[in-house]
């Protein structure tokens, strides 16, 4: 029995997400199963623009951007699970619960985001996310997103 891996390269990610540099925080999808899970990677470079001020002499990847990277991974999973959006629709980051930061992420790290689908209720989908560096948890959170027409 073989296990099939589903990967997405940057060109496919750019077709799914509206984010662009410097706010695109997913470099590659390593594996996913529609409606279940997605594993993606962000290669953290010292050339990221926010490292100039966060923090001079001790660059640390901002925690809020770790959460955003996980949220972008949930967006890709949602798109691959339910299809592309109609014109005028967006997926909105609707909420976050139980966010915890365990250790810093620094230049040179390869951050792996693992997100799993939990449930959809009243148009809001809940995902569990974890970010890892070298197999160690750096952040975990429960995130919600909603599909909606632009205001």
Swiss-Prot record:
| Residues of the active site | 54
**Looking at the Swiss-Prot or TrEMBL record, what is one Pfam family this protein matches?**
FabA
Catalytic reactions of this protein: a (3R)-hydroxyacyl-[ACP] = a (2E)-enoyl-[ACP] + H2O
Q: What is this protein called?
A: 3-hydroxyacyl-[acyl-carrier-protein] dehydratase FabZ
The cross-references to CDD domains, in alphabetical order and at most eight, read: FabZ
Task: Give the organism, scientific name.
Answer: Cronobacter sakazakii (strain ATCC BAA-894)
Q: Name one GO biological process term.
A: lipid A biosynthetic process
SUPFAM superfamilies per record: Thioesterase/thiol ester dehydrase-isomerase
Chief localization: cytoplasm
Q: Where in the cell is it found?
A: Cytoplasm
Briefly state the protein's biological role.
Involved in unsaturated fatty acids biosynthesis. Catalyzes the dehydration of short chain beta-hydroxyacyl-ACPs and long chain saturated and unsaturated beta-hydroxyacyl-ACPs.
Enumerate the InterPro entries for this protein. FabA_FabZ, FabZ, HotDog_dom_sf
UniProt-listed Enzyme Commission number(s): 4.2.1.59
UniProt record similarity statement: Belongs to the thioester dehydratase family. FabZ subfamily.
Q: Name one GO cellular component term.
A: cytoplasm
């Amino acid at each position: 029995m073989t296990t099939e891996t589903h990967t997405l390269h940057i060109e496919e990610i750019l077709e799914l997400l509206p984010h662009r540099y410097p706010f695109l925080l997913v470099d590659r999808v390593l594996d996913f199963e529609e409606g279940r899970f997605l594993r993606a990677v962000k290669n953290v470079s010292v050339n990221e623009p926010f490292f100039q001020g966060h923090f001079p002499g001790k660059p640390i990847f901002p925690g809020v951007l770790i959460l955003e990277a996980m949220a972008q991974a949930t967006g890709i999973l949602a798109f691959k699970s339910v299809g592309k959006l109609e014109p005028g629709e967006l997926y909105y980051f609707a909420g976050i619960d139980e966010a915890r930061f365990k250790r810093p992420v620094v230049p040179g790290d390869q951050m792996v985001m693992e997100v799993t689908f939990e449930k959809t209720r009243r148009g809001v989908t809940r995902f569990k996310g974890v970010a890892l560096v070298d197999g160690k948890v750096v952040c975990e959170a429960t995130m919600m997103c909603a599909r909606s027409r632009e205001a």
